[in-house]
C-alpha cells in the first residue's frame, strides 16, 4: 500500500514546474508528493514557492528547504496536490481524516489546478463509508453535536490522547457515521447552513484530476471541471 501511495505522489510532482506557486497537501499520500518536490528542489534546482495545508506539512516542507509563503501572501495557487479519504465516480470526495480539512479547502479554492493522489482502495461508488469530518467552533459544540444526533447522523467528537482533538485553527471535529451519502452536494449545502459549523469534509466537484495508483500502475482521471 505504501508503495502505491508513493507512486501516486511522485507522479503528481510531474505537474509542477519552475515559477509555480504550489499547494502542499496533508496526509499519508500527499507526504510522498512533498518529499518528491523537496528532492527536485535539491537535485534538479526546481524553483517554486509553496503554501501548506497544515502545521504537519509546514514542518515537513521546512525540513526539505521548500520555500514557503502563507496563503494570504499569494493571489492564486497554480497547482495543489492533496490526498483524499474517499472519491466517488462523480469526482466528489471526503477529506479530513487527518484533521486539516479547513486549511485544505482554503488552499484548494484559489488553485488553478487541483489534483488528488490516492491508492485504488479510496475509490467508491458512493461516499459515506468513511466517517465525514465536520469542523466546528468550540463554543456551542455540544449544541451542534446534539443537532446531528437528533438528525440521526451518529456523531462522535474526534479524540487524540484521550482529549478532544483540536485542529490547527483551534476548532473541534465531529465525525458523522453516515454509511452512505446519497446526494453529497445537497448534504454539503445542509451542513453549510448549520450555525457553528466552520467547514466540512465534503469536497464536491472541486478536483480537476485524480491520480490513482493500483496494481496495474498509475491512472489519471480528469473531471469535467478539469477538461
Curated annotation (Swiss-Prot):
Pathway: Carbohydrate degradation; pentose phosphate pathway; D-ribose 5-phosphate from D-ribulose 5-phosphate (non-oxidative stage): step 1/1. Gene3D superfamilies: 3.30.70.260, 3.40.50.1360. It comes from the Bacteria. Its EC number is 5.3.1.6. Keywords: Isomerase. Belongs to the ribose 5-phosphate isomerase family. HAMAP family: Rib_5P_isom_A. This is Ribose-5-phosphate isomerase A. It comes from Streptococcus pneumoniae serotype 2 (strain D39 / NCTC 7466).
Amino acid at each position: 500500500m505504501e508503495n502505491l501511495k508513493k507512486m501516486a505522489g511522485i507522479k503528481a510532482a510531474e505537474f509542477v514546474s519552475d515559477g509555480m506557486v504550489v499547494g502542499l497537501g496533508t496526509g499519508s499520500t500527499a507526504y510522498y508528493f512533498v518529499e518528491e518536490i523537496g528532492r527536485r528542489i535539491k537535485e534538479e534546482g526546481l524553483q517554486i514557492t509553496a503554501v501548506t495545508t497544515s502545521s504537519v506539512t509546514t514542518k515537513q516542507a521546512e525540513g526539505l528547504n521548500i520555500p514557503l509563503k502563507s496563503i494570504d501572501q499569494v493571489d492564486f495557487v497554480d497547482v495543489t496536490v492533496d490526498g483524499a479519504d474517499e472519491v466517488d465516480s462523480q469526482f466528489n470526495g471526503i477529506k479530513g481524516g487527518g484533521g486539516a480539512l479547513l486549511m485544505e479547502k482554503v488552499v484548494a479554492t484559489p488553485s488553478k489546478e487541483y489534483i488528488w493522489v490516492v491508492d485504488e482502495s479510496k475509490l467508491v461508488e458512493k461516499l459515506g463509508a468513511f466517517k465525514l469530518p465536520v469542523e466546528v467552533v468550540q463554543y456551542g459544540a455540544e449544541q451542534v453535536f446534539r443537532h446531528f444526533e437528533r438528525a440521526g447522523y451518529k456523531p462522535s467528537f474526534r479524540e487524540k490522547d484521550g482529549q478532544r482533538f483540536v485542529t490547527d485553527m483551534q476548532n473541534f471535529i465531529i465525525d458523522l457515521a453516515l454509511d452512505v451519502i446519497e446526494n453529497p452536494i445537497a448534504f454539503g449545502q445542509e451542513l453549510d447552513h448549520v450555525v457553528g459549523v466552520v467547514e466540512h469534509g465534503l469536497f464536491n466537484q472541486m478536483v480537476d484530476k485524480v491520480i490513482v495508483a493500483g496494481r496495474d500502475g498509475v491512472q489519471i482521471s480528469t473531471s469535467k471541471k478539469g477538461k
